[in-house]
Amino acid sequence: ESEIATVLPRMLRRGKVAYLFNKYSRSQQIGCVLFCHHNDQKAEPTIGDTINSWIEDNIGKDAQERTRMLQDTRGISPLFLIATKFNIDLECTKNDKQDDTSTLDKHWNRFDTVLPEIVGPSKWLDQWTVSAGVAKPFQSIYPLRDFYWSAKNGLFDGYSDGETKSPEKGHFHPGFPGYMDCLRRSFLSNQFVRDHFASPEKTWEEVATLNNDGSKPIIRDLGEISGVLDEARRKRCLERLIALKKA
C-alpha cells in the first residue's frame, strides 16, 4: 500500500498514453512515430507489440509491403528510432583502457542487446525491405546526445547551458589520450551498426563530433518525408480497400 501513491499515477499515465496512441492509430491520425529510447531502457513488456502493430497497419505487414510504401516516401521510414542520451554511450568509463580497446565494444550494448529486446521476436528489424530478393535491415536509427550532459560528464568541454551559449571543445582524457578515435573505430566495426546504419561514418560525424548532437539528420528526414507522407498513406489505404473488395 505504501507504493500506491507513486505506482498508481504512473500506471494511469501509461494507460492514458496507450489509449490515446491506439485511438489515433486506429483512426489513421498518426503519420510518423518517433520512438525514443535511452541506453538501458527497461521498456514496457507490450511496447514491442505496439510498435509492430503500428508498422503492420501503417507501413506494411512484410518486407514487400514496406518496400512499396517506402517507394512513395523517398525511402524514408515513417518510423524513427531515436537513440536518446547517446552521450552516455560515448562517455569514457573507468573500465576503458588504452591497452585493451576491446572493452569499448560494451559501449554499444544499446544496439546489441537493449533494442533487439524491445523489438522482440518481430522480424522487421532485420527484414525491413527487400531488394532483388534480398532482405534489407531497418536503417532509420538516429543517435541523439545532449550538449549539456556531454560537457557535464567530460565527453566534450566548453558548452554552457546558461543564457550565453558557447561552442563545444575537444576533451582530453589523461588516461586514454586517443579515446575518441578508438571509440569511433569500435563504433564503425560493430556489426549492428554496419547492418543498421546506411552510412556509419556519416552517423558518427553527425552525432559524435564537435557541435553536432544528432538532431540535424532527424530534422532533415522529417522535412523530406513530410511533403509526401499524406499521399503515400492515401495510396496505401486505397490499395488495402481494393484488396479487401477482391477478397
Language model: regions and residue ranges:
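Conserved GTPase G-domain substructure that encodes guanine base recognition and part of the catalytic core
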Residues: 6-33, 39-246
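Switch I (G2) and immediately adjacent beta-strands of P-loop GTPase domains
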Residues: 1-2
